[in-house]
Amino acid sequence: MFAQRQMFFARLAANLRAPAVRQTVQRRFASTPANESGKNAFVREREAVKQHAAETTELWRKISLYGIPPALALAGYNAYTLYNEHWEHWSHLPPLEERTEYPYQNIRTRNYPWGDGDKTLFWNESVNYHNRDKVT
């Protein structure tokens, strides 16, 4: 136990001592050029990659800000026009004949707690069909 305490206090004393004085100026080796003209291939490649990344980022920023909103507006206008044409066409058609309702459709064991109790939460009168008088 005494040896463990001795090791602990030796480490503590080493940590509390003042740190070694370091040079404030970085040491330059004789082979390191001080000017920019002596860049090696790695540094030149890294700078080229950095420049390419900046240009590509700017390109996609411009596409996102100036290209996407008009494309979304055109697509939205097209969808709206097609939707209106579709329902305009359906309004001119004669009424549909009674649809066949199969035994596995619209099974109700009890009424829903909303509305008249027979329609689901997302019921759409112009699309969904339910014959209350069906015989199973």
From Swiss-Prot:
Gene3D superfamilies (alphabetical)? Cytochrome c oxidase, subunit VIa (4.10.95.10)
- Could you mention a single GO BP entry for this protein? mitochondrial respirasome assembly
Q: How does it sit in the membrane?
A: Single-pass membrane protein
Tell me where it mainly resides.
Answer: mitochondrion
Q: Which Pfam families match?
A: COX6A
The biological pathway it contributes to is: Energy metabolism; oxidative phosphorylation
**Chain's role:** Component of the cytochrome c oxidase, the last enzyme in the mitochondrial electron transport chain which drives oxidative phosphorylation. The respiratory chain contains 3 multisubunit complexes succinate dehydrogenase (complex II, CII), ubiquinol-cytochrome c oxidoreductase (cytochrome b-c1 complex, complex III, CIII) and cytochrome c oxidase (complex IV, CIV), that cooperate to transfer electrons derived from NADH and succinate to molecular oxygen, creating an electrochemical gradient over the inner membrane that drives transmembrane transport and the ATP synthase.
Task: From the Swiss-Prot or TrEMBL record, give the protein name.
Answer: Cytochrome c oxidase subunit 13, mitochondrial
Record the organism. Answer: Neurospora crassa (strain ATCC 24698 / 74-OR23-1A / CBS 708.71 / DSM 1257 / FGSC 987)
What lineage is this protein's organism placed in? Eukaryota, Fungi, Dikarya, Ascomycota, Pezizomycotina
